[in-house]
Amino acid sequence: MGNLKSVGQEPGPPCGLGLGLGLGLCGKQGPASPAPEPSQAPAPPSPTRPAPDHSPPLTRPPDGPRFPRVKNWEVGSITYDTLSAQAQQDGPCTSRRCLGSLVFPRKLQSRPTQGPSPTEQLLGQARDFINQYYNSIKRSGSQAHEQRLQEVEAEVAATGTYQLRESELVFGAKQAWRNAPRCVGRIQWGKLQVFDARDCRTAQEMFTYICNHIKYATNRGNLRSAITVFPQRCPGRGDFRIWNSQLIRYAGYRQQDGSVRGDPANVEITELCIQHGWTPGNGRFDVLPLLLQAPDEPPELFTLPPEMVLEVPLEHPTLEWFAALGLRWYALPAVSNMLLEIGGLEFPAAPFSGWYMSSEIGMRDLCDPHRYNILEDVAVCMDLDTRTTSSLWKDKAAVEINVAVLHSYQLAKVTIVDHHAATASFMKHLENEQKARGGCPADWAWIVPPISGSLTPVFHQEMVNYFLSPAFRYQPDPWKGSAAKGAGITRKKTFKEVANAVKISASLMGTVMAKRVKATILYGSETGRAQSYAQQLGRLFRKAFDPRVLCMDEYDVVSLEHEALVLVVTSTFGNGDPPENGESFAAALMEMSGPYNSSPRPEQHKSYKIRFNSVSCSDPLVSSWRRKRKESSNTDSAGALGTLRFCVFGLGSRAYPHFCAFARAVDTRLEELGGERLLQLGQGDELCGQEEAFRGWAQAAFQAACETFCVGEDAKAAARDIFSPKRSWKRQRYRLSTQAESLQLLPGLTHVHRRKMFQATILSVENLQSSKSTRATILVRLDTGGQEGLQYQPGDHIGVCPPNRPGLVEALLSRVEDPPPSTEPVAVEQLEKGSPGGPPPGWVRDPRLPPCTLRQALTYFLDITSPPSPRLLRLLSTLAEESSEQQELEALSQDPRRYEEWKWFSCPTLLEVLEQFPSVALPAPLILTQLPLLQPRYYSVSSAPSAHPGEIHLTIAVLAYRTQDGLGPLHYGVCSTWMSQLKAGDPVPCFIRGAPSFRLPPDPNLPCILVGPGTGIAPFRGFWQDRLHDIEIKGLQPAPMTLVFGCRCSQLDHLYRDEVLDAQQRGVFGQVLTAFSRDPGSPKTYVQDLLRTELAAEVHRVLCLEQGHMFVCGDVTMATSVLQTVQRILATEGGMELDEAGDVIGVLRDQQRYHEDIFGLTLRTQEVTSRIRTQSFSLQERQLRGAVPWSFDPPGPEIPGS
């Protein structure tokens, strides 16, 4: 399809195969193994469906079924075509005659059958296709596979036919191109864009679909392969047909003297167009209108808008007179009269397009005697001797015509490929197919180009021609024979009617294109913010596309191969990991193979989390395939995701060392697998204008997608409209309805957070700090009741779902406008607009929250303590009665810098905002639909189940602080404050989140260094308890560990001092070092200082010489500083450069021997946070202006020691 011949009214290629290569080209083929040639040797049996990694045998195979032996006469290589055993149809040749040079062998034409197709025949073809599809997605034999086969069988039994799913249609259309033996450009088969037009009902709708196909495929000269599939053939109903052989063709006018002006190949269709009302011109290059036929209706005439047809005037780079010949040709070759067969289903109207091979225009269209026949005219202009063939005037003129074609298309920036590049790519395709499928059907007579035959590699390559399914097949012209049902001549349409048809088409184009261009929006989220952004993106893309919004764990990654447009919005969890609901997606994405990394390499077997943490533009692997991708062209193989266009937006915090690591990795991986990036990676920093960054990226992504798929005429206006506060929430579209059911808390939390919740109970809460300390750190002991869902291993995390403070809830309830009764469970209902063919307009329940009272929603489910987002401030501005408050809220929501300064200085709760802007009304539906969800709080488990069965211990710093530089209101940590006030027996909703990358090594003899200041000691308590159990119960003698702890003062906050000393005396620890940052009379010391001054040699020995492990737990600044210190230690002690030491740490991470458990920002990181925000402001502002790409990431700040 990369270079398609017009197959409607053109004769075949020249005969004369040369070198005897025609032998066996078209030997009679059957569904079983073909009869071998005398020179063939027996070959091994072919599996029903060869495995993708099948390699061609290079030696004579053992006895068994015989397969064609295929030789390349240029290099002498030999392969065996085992795929030919799966041929679905007999070829036209017999044992006594070769019909390989016939253009339209009658045996290969697909003709409508009288009555329904035999059920068993259709079922056999359907089963074979469904098996192919499920093999391709590696789901063969699965329950879904068996269920699909049963569905098809039942549908065929009931209706005599069946319907393909959209993914099956996409797969089938691509396979049909892949199986086309006469196409030389098949290496790009994976990049075919499939447009599903099976909902088409009229010829007018056909024309609209075709206009969109032409617009998309032409793409302002950067041609893209595409196919539009109209409804299938059905028993008892006529066909959808396109009478033209190509969507764009030049008219041929028969003159009185018998000559033809224009293209002689199109005389018949030209006369038919005139009979159906077309007013012809009299030029040599008049674009024909289209004759389109809906079932059982006469054909209708439609004129293509002139601006839709891209044409290239032909000129020569050195022959100035060539332009005066007035030659031109159209850019887009789009074959429209062939039938697409998939799984026994026939689609008589399935126009497909690619791009030209230059010799198709330069030799066949312009030089063939029965076409434009310009060869002698050009030769005369070149002063060549045309009286004798020995002057080779034809060859010389033909070369210059081809040079002119290539030059003109390249000058006009229109995609075209020369015959040398095209045939070289076909040889690569043959090699790929031999490895993947064991063979490749190819018609030598059509593959060898009509110029420079033996100068191209395909001339010397033997080929085997056979016919697989799915396939493109020839079919009779619709106005001839039995196909002419309903093809009567209609009255001539007036010019006004034709013009109106064009006008109607133009108005419908965007609507219909949107109807069939689907967009998948995937999100991975820990806090719900990525989900909220994805839903906003869905509302935006609904303006011009058919979007669906899915969580990553609800999506089958194999569907990526059949997607046209995917947008990803994802956060990054902890130390650069995927969010939990993105882990399965990440793993599956890593397992896929791409066009530039298909060979197995050790580095590709890294843990997907580890590789995600390290993927960057400087990664040698990434740089290698990115260079190959940049150098690729239309003659290179497409990847598994060749038709995919994608955009990625990442959410994160630049305070973390792996900022947006998962989003970066998804963006990198999708490109690596062959996808086309529409927009550079977008990144939203929670420290600086995240929402504004998302809005700017979303609008840019929407505009890029609209331009790519030729939809959405006013993309910018649509984007502005969707982000308007008046559009995002309207009073009249929401209402409260009373519900009979009352809230059950655990099921309610399970519903909201989409994960199973369990109830533990408090055993005790103990303050670990001295009574003289002004701060508090508590040890919380929970009773799990032996519940299986609360089982854990040391190093794992627990998620706790806290309630909001009752006083804060009551104060907010007093501000609610017209609240429902306090004890009455309610649910929010939203007024949904109806859609044609969809559900009617009506009130639909919002599923975000379970039925509950407003007080319960504010207590358990909604976040009322975090500063309101700019989007929420914009909504509140529309509800303010005072104009000054409305203007202030609007200004805060629109100015990112002003908003960030306000947020970080005041850190206001929702109640404090309402107190600052008292005229704001607060409707209950707005609270229930627009406030963010109250997120679980994660803590490292501080116990070992072997030491405390049925219990979970937590070490929690109780948070309390004043905003506005210590002069503002007192704020409390939601979870830590709540847990500090609990009593024995109180319930705690919670769940376990495993941390498999932060666990002690299975071999207890490996040395370990543990580094954790403050509450960073929490997971290590579980470690030493587990080791004590190994020593005293199991009788093991593990290698002593080294603990490096840090706190402020030895007399106030030295956590677990007695426990640590006891563990050291009993053999768990070899060394225990403590850094005090504020001890009176002692220098300020941090844990990284102890590593550098006391443990440098041991760090190097443990990590580089003894295969040991290092564990670091703490906030982001401490973890980063420790990492930098370890890097310097390895460089100094190991005698290496700093960069080399960094590579060593990368290897340690790959081997999972350097472990980090990083928790969020604390009050100590405020200085660093402020500095990061300051650096990020200018970046964000430049991104929004378009001055820098979205993926630009400045160097991280220098982070001081903790």
Swiss-Prot record:
Cofactor binding note from Swiss-Prot or TrEMBL: Binds 1 FAD.
Compositionally biased spans, kind Pro residues: 33-65
Entry's localization field: Membrane, Caveola; Cytoplasm, Cytoskeleton; Golgi apparatus; Cell membrane
Binding site residues for FAD: H797, R937, Y939, S940, T955, A957, Y961, V974, C975, S976
Cofactor: heme b; FAD; FMN; (6R)-L-erythro-5,6,7,8-tetrahydrobiopterin
Region (Interaction with NOSIP): 97-485
One Pfam family named in its UniProt record: FAD_binding_1
Gly residues biased stretches: 15-27
UniProt-annotated binding residues for Zn(2+): C93, C98
GO molecular function, one term: tetrahydrobiopterin binding
Subunit organization: Homodimer. Interacts with NOSIP and NOSTRIN. Interacts with HSP90AB1. Forms a complex with ASL, ASS1 and SLC7A1; the complex regulates cell-autonomous L-arginine synthesis and citrulline recycling while channeling extracellular L-arginine to nitric oxide synthesis pathway.
Name this polypeptide is given: Nitric oxide synthase 3
Organism: Mus musculus
Gene name tied to this protein: Nos3
